[in-house]
């Protein structure tokens, strides 16, 4: 009779150990339970200022790094590039197709209304990523500059996902109304011109900017179209949500039939982060 409690205790300990082993095995099969699919990937190190999609040898350009990076994988820069400028000349995406609002119009009541969210054409982007993107120049004392210097107007960077940008300057971007691709998904979506949004950076997600300078970027809508499609929004930055720390946003503009957010236009809400940023 006295042995039964001891047997029960041993059985309880055995079940506890077995449960722990099963849990550890499950975590191991899921990448260690890190929340990011396992150990963090080593950063991709950009070692050239040249704008080239398929560089030869051991050369790594920013464009090639963005193409090969996994979602959220850190992209850094070789110390020899400190203070350098990457002059972007390649249009990475001629028709940047992303989800956007389609508005209808109630003529009798003279009001517009939201039809829904469908694919829209946001025009040319020099760099385009359909994943979380992490560009980190924080190890460079003078950072890195991304400058659009191509022939046709294009925004500097578009991201369908979250963007983390550290110690990077963005300049020279232009987002303009132009002939749109035929991607209409709804009778009310009669988009004929590309949407002028985020000439510097356009992010369909959270834009986290730290120690960045966004300057001299310009969004130009259709001056003859007073609808939302004809407007221009976010000369410097256009994003669902923006978190900015120690940033300068200056000299960016918007113009068109309707325009807002010459420096920053936030679709969902703004968070200035832990320290003050300057927007002018």
Go through each PLM region and give its residues.
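Ser/Thr-rich, Pro/Gly/Ala-heavy low-complexity intrinsically disordered linkers and tails
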Residues: 35-39, 210, 234
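Short glycine/acidic-rich loop motifs that flank beta-strands on beta-rich extracellular proteins
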Residues: 149-154, 174-181, 218-226, 253-260
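N-terminal, post-signal-peptide segments of secreted/periplasmic proteins
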Residues: 30-197
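Glycine-rich beta-solenoid repeat tracts in large extracellular/virion proteins
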Residues: 103, 113-116, 124-129, 155-160, ...
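N-terminal secretory signal peptides that target proteins for export/translocation
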Residues: 1-11
């Amino acid at each position: 009779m006295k042995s039964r409690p001891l047997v029960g205790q041993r059985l309880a300990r055995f079940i506890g150990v077995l449960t722990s082993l099963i849990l550890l095995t499950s975590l191991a099969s899921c990448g260690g339970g890190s929340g990011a699919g396992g150990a963090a990937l080593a950063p991709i190190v950009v070692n050239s200022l040249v704008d080239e999609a398929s560089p030869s040898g051991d050369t790594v350009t920013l464009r090639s790094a963005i193409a090969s990076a996994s979602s959220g994988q850190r992209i850094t820069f070789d110390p020899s590039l400190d203070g350098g400028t990457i002059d972007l000349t390649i249009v990475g995406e001629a028709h940047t197709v992303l989800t956007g609002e389609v508005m209808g119009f109630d003529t009798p009541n003279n009001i517009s209304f939201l039809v829904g969210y469908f694919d829209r054409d946001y025009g040319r982007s020099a760099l385009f990523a359909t994943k979380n993107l992490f560009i980190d120049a924080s190890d460079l004392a003078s950072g890195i500059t991304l400058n659009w210097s191509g022939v046709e107007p294009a925004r500097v960077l578009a991201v369908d996902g979250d963007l983390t940008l550290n110690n990077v300057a963005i300049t020279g971007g232009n987002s303009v109304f132009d002939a749109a691709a035929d991607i209409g998904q709804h009778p009310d979506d009669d988009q004929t011109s590309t949407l002028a949004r985020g000439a510097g950076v356009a992010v369909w997600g959270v834009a986290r900017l730290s120690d960045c300078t966004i300057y001299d970027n310009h969004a130009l809508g259709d001056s003859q179209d007073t609808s939302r499609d004809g407007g221009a929004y976010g000369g410097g930055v256009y994003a669902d949500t923006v978190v900015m720390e120690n940033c300068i946003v200056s000299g960016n503009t918007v113009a068109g039939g309707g325009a807002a957010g010459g420096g920053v236009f936030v679709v969902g809400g703004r968070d200035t982060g832990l320290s003050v940023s300057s927007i002018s």
